[in-house]
Swiss-Prot record:
Pfam families: MIP. Aquaporins contain two tandem repeats each containing three membrane-spanning domains and a pore-forming loop with the signature motif Asn-Pro-Ala (NPA). PROSITE patterns: MIP. Belongs to the MIP/aquaporin (TC 1.A.8) family. PIP (TC 1.A.8.11) subfamily. The chain crosses the membrane at residues 43-63, 80-100, 131-151, 173-193, 207-227, 255-275. The keyword Transmembrane applies. GO terms for molecular function: water channel activity. InterPro entries: Aquaporin-like, Aquaporin_transptr, MIP, MIP_CS. Residues 1-25 are annotated as: Disordered. This is Aquaporin PIP2-3. Keywords: Cell membrane, Membrane, Repeat, Transmembrane, Transmembrane helix, Transport. Aquaporins facilitate the transport of water and small neutral solutes across cell membranes.
Amino acid sequence: MAKQDIEASGPEAGEFSAKDYTDPPPAPLIDADELTKWSLYRAVIAEFIATLLFLYITVATVIGYKHQTDAAASGPDAACGGVGILGIAWAFGGMIFILVYCTAGISGGHINPAVTFGLFLARKVSLVRALLYIIAQCLGAICGVGLVKGFQSAYYVRYGGGANELSDGYSKGTGLAAEIIGTFVLVYTVFSATDPKRSARDSHVPVLAPLPIGFAVFMVHLATIPITGTGINPARSLGAAVIYNKDKAWDDQWIFWVGPLIGAAIAAAYHQYVLRASATKLGSYRSNA
């Protein structure tokens, strides 16, 4: 027997082929018992507050940036001031990092209907929980933007209210594609960063998971702010549209729902049926897909 054959039949081969990991069971489609548990309502409250804080900080950053760079308000050197697109991207990505870290152990730290939808399709959450999360996220977003308008009433409408709108020069198809791809990047990162198989092998992964998720949001914003202002989060887009309440924001609103939901669905399918399926063939873990 060749030396490499002996090595392949040793402990390392056993570690490779052994089913040292078992997926958690899929969440039930409808779990009525959840409605009797305080943990569900605590998680819903956490999603509401997290989305409120997310929209308050990020939209306030956008309004502040536009005010600082308004030549009429800040003088001829306005273009050199403000946080710039890079700073706005950091505000969105940084807040996601902070809020996911704070709420991951309570609600899973979704803060985004597209993320919730993707996890629902992958049977990570029940339909009941998914619906309550999405409602809480949308209400939290509306309240968060409402706070911005209340605190910055002099500038809110003048500088666009932080609403997502398709930029001039881009077609609706381009905007939709940008939202699909951007949300795919985010939800794919969520699945990869929170993969229980990876967590089982590396104990530090759950602690670090918010970092790549926040960084994904940051990178997507750099790419898509010039196109759509970056939605990738239907609650974020809806909250700003409700408070800003201008025709352009409402006319483009469908892009910021259809695009993210399609992107989330593609990411869920890719993770469940391509990446996990290949792992199953190698025998490294059992798939419930």
